[in-house]
A protein has these predicted regions:
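Conserved phosphate-donor/acceptor-positioning beta-strand/loop module used by diverse small-molecule
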Residues: 120-125
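Short beta->alpha connector loops
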Residues: 92-96, 126, 164-168
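Positively charged interface segments
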Residues: 160
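Conserved alpha-helical substructure of the radical SAM core
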Residues: 1-119, 130-157, 181-182, 188-214
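Catalytic cores of alpha/beta
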Residues: 166-180
Length: 215
């Protein structure tokens, strides 16, 4: 049997996503109960070293913080390849810079054969700053777009994950065009939480757009 691992590397994040567990939905502030900290590299290695089974992929998720906030994210990525050939990173895209993404893409894309290396999942929910900010408050859209562009145009594996809200579903055509321009696969998913929940009527219109653009 093959096992996958999901690690929360950090509880730090610059975003104030209102449906995120780390964020107070009413104020946008960090939850009072949340202790901000970064995982130690030794903790990561100590969890994996004794594991006796084959590992499919290691994922650094953004459940309580963005992994790119971790000051040693590079070391975690590099160390992961002692245990697997496939590393996934989830991010809002607004951290680091295009040079960082370019170097990572050129170093870790298909570096041990086809479909191995680093796979980025970018959570960006709009085609402009104001729209993305409605959920991803605190994220610089222009920076996120530049980072996505650097990753995908340099051969990086991954996907653009676009949550559909009542305020952004009409941007499906533009998002598809932008994804195509940078060679990115785009994945749309309907938000099912109360903040920004799309109406049934608009959801049906969005479904028709998704069919039209075959996504």
């Amino acid at each position: 049997m093959i096992y996958n691992f999901d690690f929360w590397l950090t509880t730090y994040c610059q975003a104030k996503c209102r449906s995120c567990a780390r964020t107070n939905e009413n104020t946008g502030d960090q939850q009072e109960w949340l202790n901000t900290s970064h995982m130690k590299l030794d903790t990561f290695k100590n969890r994996l070293d004794p594991f006796p089974h084959e590992i499919g992929y290691i994922q650094f998720c953004g459940e309580m913080g963005d992994p790119c906030m971790h000051p040693k994210i590079n070391e975690f990525v590099e160390t992961s390849f002692n245990y697997t050939n496939d590393v996934h990173v989830l991010t809002n895209g607004g951290l680091r810079n295009p040079d960082w993404y370019t170097r990572l893409a050129k170093t870790y894309t298909n570096f041990r054969g086809k479909r191995t290396g680093v796979y980025f999942k970018f959570g960006v929910d709009g085609t402009d700053h104001d729209t993305n900010w409605l959920y991803r408050e605190g994220v610089n859209f222009d920076k996120a777009h530049e980072n996505m562009h650097a990753w995908f145009t340099n051969g990086g594996r991954g996907a653009w994950h676009f949550l559909l809200f009542d305020w952004n579903w009409h941007q499906i055509p533009e998002a598809c065009r932008m994804a195509k321009d940078m060679g990115a696969y785009i994945n749309f998913k309907f938000n099912n939480r109360s903040h920004g929940l799309i109406s049934n009527e608009d959801k049906q219109a969005a479904v028709e757009l998704l069919k039209e653009f075959d996504v």
